[in-house]
């Protein structure tokens, strides 16, 4: 046994030096000899230490991926395309600290920032308890991921055991190196397809039910955060050092005091990008002080204390074959480039955006030309210009003079082309109806794009208000509509008449107004009439509404056809209403609340929204600052921690009693 333990200790030490410190202390051949000897001894003695390097590679094929809930949400980051946006982020953090310190006796430290590489692999979340790896999961939705515990054990530098005995979740990125990709593609089996890029190599490995195949990819990982911990740390840099002390390979970082230092760090990372063994697509800038980060909080989508600066996307060239003109919900006619298929960042691209005719002329883009193609944010293909190596004939791109769908005359507003035939232009009407009926809007259950197309083509629906004139008999004349389906849709349409004001505002399809903006407008103006009459200057006073959005709202309600459509909706019984939460009477007002376990009457999103409507601050973990924990079935560690800290625990039934008591 002692020989086995000695070999495990040595091999883990060698792996740590190789993968974490990037400083090999034995030759590969020597390591392989020791590894084979350990494997032989384990087979002979049937003694297995879970921390043995032989336990990294599984030999099983799983049936399916199980869903798993993360203890805390794994957030995505806000993106910056320009250095000015990074500077604005830094200034925002500085201003926040200054304003906070003016009104609080306990002062926050001057902002420091930690700059790290933005890794381009597959995000993983690894849970440890009592020093053992107990679960690994993909990021998934940020709240629910897929269990990849067995797959993660093939990651060459992921510790199966650590010294720290508490409970932690480690957040990082699984990566395939350039050498591993080259080796994999050089040793393909018959009929196997070569891997196209590093990110897909990593993602495909961890989402493979065949663990042997996962192991072939020889993945590594870098870690950069604790998504959950019972350890008290004051700085983000302390988190990184703690991770390193536990044997995790951490991402390289720089501590910066101001924008100039951050700018230099960004440039330094950009210079080494191409020489790295793994892919990065930018730089992450994050506040170092954890308490300041907590106080800054989150938007709907991302933390306010961090931002990702994106590097310029990779480019390639291809031939532009043709241009297709498509009509959107607003009537805007958008050009789309049809391309000679080309591989870009591991994806075959056949189409790309052209923005508008002014952009086409400015870039001198022509049919038949060879063009520079870029994937903005490595997602959306965009034509950046033409090359000098175009061969053969080229042809000017001409703007259409009539709508390609309905034949109506086109008008130009600014740089964009519009079809003003809102009544009988199929794409406009169908997309408008689908948007109006969508879940975040009027929430008409059972409504689909196919239904909208039939309503337009067979029932001659020419406006949103026509939805409320449809009869059951008319619906039954459509394809696949029988008695029950027709009745259900009629009932859903009728039910939608009683709607929340923010849903109604969003359903109208006001340019540049999403659901959050619609909600902000309702909170500010309280009624639809007030929103409709709001001036440009009143609108820009609303948080997060700038000049472009304000102008869109004013211009929208000025239109005679919009006024007519709204009046028809109201005459047909649509009654949007706004109910302001009386948070002052709620026992949860300004209280920090954590919900845990499975609740009978609420999803995670619903309980969060309910608590926020009652004035509560919803947290993802239990601490001394937590006022209440709402515990459902299988509450787990959060419940245990609440008991240990003496936090007041509410059952779902008690929670609802408290709500009812203040009505």
Swiss-Prot record:
Look up the signal peptide feature and give its range. Answer: none
Please name the HAMAP family in this protein's record.
Answer: DNA_ligase_A
Supply the alphabetized keyword list.
Answer: DNA damage, DNA repair, DNA replication, Ligase, Magnesium, Manganese, Metal-binding, NAD, Zinc
EC number(s) reported in the record: 6.5.1.2
Give cofactor(s), names only: Mg(2+); Mn(2+)
Per the record, the domain of life is Bacteria
Which reactions are catalysed by this chain?
NAD(+) + (deoxyribonucleotide)n-3'-hydroxyl + 5'-phospho-(deoxyribonucleotide)m = (deoxyribonucleotide)n+m + AMP + beta-nicotinamide D-nucleotide
Catalytic residues (UniProt): 118
Cross-referenced InterPro entries: BRCT_dom (IPR001357), BRCT_dom_sf (IPR036420), DisA/LigA_HHH (IPR041663), DNA_ligase (IPR001679), DNA_ligase_CS (IPR033136), DNAligase_adenylation (IPR013839), DNAligase_N (IPR013840), Hlx-hairpin-Hlx_DNA-bd_motif (IPR003583)
Record-level Gene Ontology MF annotations: DNA binding; DNA ligase (NAD+) activity; metal ion binding
Chain sites annotated for binding Zn(2+): 403, 406, 419, 425
The keyword Magnesium is assigned to this record: yes
Membership in a protein family: Belongs to the NAD-dependent DNA ligase family. LigA subfamily.
Briefly, what is this protein's role? DNA ligase that catalyzes the formation of phosphodiester linkages between 5'-phosphoryl and 3'-hydroxyl groups in double-stranded DNA using NAD as a coenzyme and as the energy source for the reaction. It is essential for DNA replication and repair of damaged DNA.
Lineage, opening ranks: Bacteria, Bacillati, Bacillota, Clostridia, Eubacteriales
Q: Which Gene Ontology BP terms does the record give?
A: DNA repair; DNA replication
Record Pfam families: BRCT (PF00533), DNA_ligase_aden (PF01653), DNA_ligase_OB (PF03120), HHH_2 (PF12826), HHH_5 (PF14520)
- Annotated positions binding NAD(+): 28-32, 76-77, 139, 173, 310
Q: Which PROSITE patterns match?
A: BRCT (PS50172), DNA_LIGASE_N2 (PS01056)
Organism whose genome encodes this protein: Clostridium acetobutylicum (strain ATCC 824 / DSM 792 / JCM 1419 / IAM 19013 / LMG 5710 / NBRC 13948 / NRRL B-527 / VKM B-1787 / 2291 / W)
Q: Which GO terms describe its cellular component?
A: cytosol
Give me the gene this protein comes from.
ligA1
Q: Where is the BRCT domain?
A: 583-663
Q: What is this protein called?
A: DNA ligase 1
